[in-house]
């Protein structure tokens, strides 16, 4: 084991020395040739700044510009709320203190912006109602073009309870933006919302019943994706809703689909009602039998069935333990208790000391009157009941009959919703500093993607440039999740442990102590080593003698001249021919039977 350790240490040390020695030799060879260049570089470094350190790429902000026709687009980079109208309404059925929509809005940069010059709409106050809206360039009509709504949200302080969704306000003669409130008719509501641990991404549209004219909200199914990160990571996220004329829809976050479906199949409640409904006037007949099982009417109670037998009986085999104190009560008055000074016997009655466990019973098996313990009665059967059998008159669970739905309609084009002419934010939030940016309403996917790349794309690039390296990210992650430190330690320690194990592992030699555990005689290790060394020395002397003899023979052969060498050369080919002939099968003698 010690030899393995020494070998590992020598290998590591030797490698280091060799590398250092090679580097030193190279430096000695080149030092005279490069001396002048080094002096010049030192002088240049004094006059020029050091640019060897890597610098993070700088992202320059430029306000996005729509590359095609849009119904609405605003990046807020002009620095004002121009075009937006603050609501002056009051919310119904709410205390006057919080009924007003008096929440503050401002246009400003993010608090920790990585893209100077990029401004957005900021919800500034908490625990207040906020409402702000803006007119579209022209109303959006649901015809042959898709509808694409997109905007950015950053929960700069996280989010405790509140929403960041937009409403597309329906085009109606009554629409008045300075009276925008929670009951203002809208066509679509879309965006993130959170309260407690319930994380939502709303897509709701109001569908008009063509028969009654009543509007009903239709909610998209919940996304399968985990939405929590979008609310907690304090990064800017891009929310996109795409509605197509074929009734399909897609919901994207950061340009990745998190939900999709069809307006006809994936909304709750469904757009179209059932063709048939249960008759509300139908009633179950009195003789309708819903019992799948009934008691057997032909069953008879057995004669030996005793319904009066108790479930428990005293154990007749039990005996009173020795030392049982029959005359001692289990509880006695506390001798140390005293009547309270404020005790009024007229009001509280006669005072009695509280009961405590009898100290004499602690050393005894029990006190008081001894009673036999109760055991299960083997003859107990309980009240007799006839066995259950299948009901021959079973008719199943009754349901009212189906009748045609008088309110049935079939709308195969729910995409053709109520036109809208404004976009608004009507929010309640317990968290301030919610940042909105780069709203766009359009019918061209290419234009929306260009707008996203020029706006949100720059934010993403700036965030990436400012992010720490891999080590920094690992440290940040471990600060949020301390158990990651264990993973890091194991990841580093495991390879080191394997290297040590490889270097130090070897076949374990038996020790003298182990030899003594067996009856077989064992040789003395030291004597064997001495004998091996003596044999090795003798072998070395013999090899030296043989080498000297061979050298002497060679010198004698050289003195004899070239005659012997020539004869030897002549004999070699002949000997080789004889050997080949002897190996040939034809020259072998037949074997006698």
Curated annotation (Swiss-Prot):
It is found in: Endoplasmic reticulum membrane; Mitochondrion membrane; Melanosome membrane. Residues 21-482 are lumenal. The keyword Repeat applies. The modification Phosphoserine is found at residues 555, 565, 584. Residues 324-346, 526-548 have a biased composition (Acidic residues). Residues 1-20 form the signal peptide. The chain crosses the membrane at residues 483-503. Residues 261-346, 511-593 are annotated as: Disordered. This is Calnexin. It comes from Canis lupus familiaris. The lineage of its organism: Eukaryota, Metazoa, Chordata, Craniata, Vertebrata.
């Amino acid at each position: 084991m010690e030899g393995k350790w020494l070998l590992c240490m020598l290998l590591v040390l030797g490698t280091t020395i060799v590398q250092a020695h090679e580097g030193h030799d190279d430096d000695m060879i080149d030092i005279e040739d490069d001396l002048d260049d080094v002096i010049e570089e030192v002088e240049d470094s004094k006059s020029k700044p050091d640019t060897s350190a890597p610098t993070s790429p700088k992202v320059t902000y430029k306000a996005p510009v729509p590359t095609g026709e849009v119904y609405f687009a605003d990046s807020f980079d002009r620095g004002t709320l121009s075009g937006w109208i603050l609501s002056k309404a009051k919310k119904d059925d709410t205390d006057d203190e919080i009924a007003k929509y008096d929440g503050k809005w401002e246009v400003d940069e993010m608090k920790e912006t990585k893209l100077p010059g990029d401004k957005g709409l900021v919800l500034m106050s908490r625990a207040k109602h906020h409402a702000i809206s803006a007119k579209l360039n022209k109303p959006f009509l649901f015809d042959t073009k898709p509808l694409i709504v997109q905007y950015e949200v950053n929960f700069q302080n996280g989010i405790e309870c509140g929403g960041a969704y937009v409403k597309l306000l329906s085009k109606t003669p009554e629409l008045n933006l300075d009276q925008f409130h929670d009951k203002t008719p809208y066509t679509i509501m879309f965006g993130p919302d959170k309260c407690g641990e319930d994380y939502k991404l709303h897509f709701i549209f109001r569908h008009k019943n063509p028969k009654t004219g009543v509007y009903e909200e239709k909610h998209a199914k919940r996304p399968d994706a985990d939405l929590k990160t979008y609310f907690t990571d304090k990064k800017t996220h891009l929310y996109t809703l795409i509605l197509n004329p074929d009734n399909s829809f897609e919901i994207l976050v950061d340009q990745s689909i998190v939900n999709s479906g069809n307006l006809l199949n994936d909304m709750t409640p469904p757009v179209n009602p059932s063709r048939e409904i249960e008759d509300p006037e139908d009633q179950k007949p009195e003789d309708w039998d819903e019992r799948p099982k009934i008691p057997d009417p032909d069953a008879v109670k057995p004669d030996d069935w005793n319904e009066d037998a108790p479930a428990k009986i005293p154990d007749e085999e039990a005996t009173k333990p020795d030392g049982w104190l029959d005359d001692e009560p289990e509880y006695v008055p506390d001798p140390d208790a005293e009547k309270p000074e404020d005790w009024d016997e007229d009001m509280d009655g006669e005072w009695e000391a509280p009961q405590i466990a009898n100290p004499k019973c602690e050393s005894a098996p029990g006190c008081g009157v001894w009673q036999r313990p109760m055991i299960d009665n083997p003859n107990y059967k309980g009240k007799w009941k006839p066995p259950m059998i299948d009901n021959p008159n079973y008719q199943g669970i009754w349901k009212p009959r189906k009748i045609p739905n008088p309110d049935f309609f079939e709308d195969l084009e729910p995409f053709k919703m109520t036109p809208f002419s404004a976009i608004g934010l009507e929010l309640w939030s317990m968290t301030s500093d919610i940042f909105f940016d780069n709203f766009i309403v359009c019918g061209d996917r290419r234009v929306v993607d260009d707008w996203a790349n020029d706006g949100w794309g720059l934010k993403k690039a700036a965030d990436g440039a400012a992010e720490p390296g891999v080590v920094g990210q690992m440290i940040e992650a471990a600060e949020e999740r301390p158990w990651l430190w264990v993973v890091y330690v194991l990841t580093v320690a495991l390879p080191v442990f394997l290297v040590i194990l490889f270097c130090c592992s070897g076949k374990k030699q038996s020790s003298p102590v182990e030899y003594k555990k067996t009856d077989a005689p064992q040789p003395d290790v030291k004597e064997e080593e001495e004998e091996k060394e003596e044999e090795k020395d003798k072998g070395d002397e013999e090899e030296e003698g043989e080498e000297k003899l061979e050298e002497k023979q060679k010198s004698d052969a050289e003195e004899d001249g070239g005659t012997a060498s020539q004869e030897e050369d002549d004999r070699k080919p002949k000997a080789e021919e004889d050997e080949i002939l002897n190996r040939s099968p034809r020259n072998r003698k037949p074997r006698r039977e």
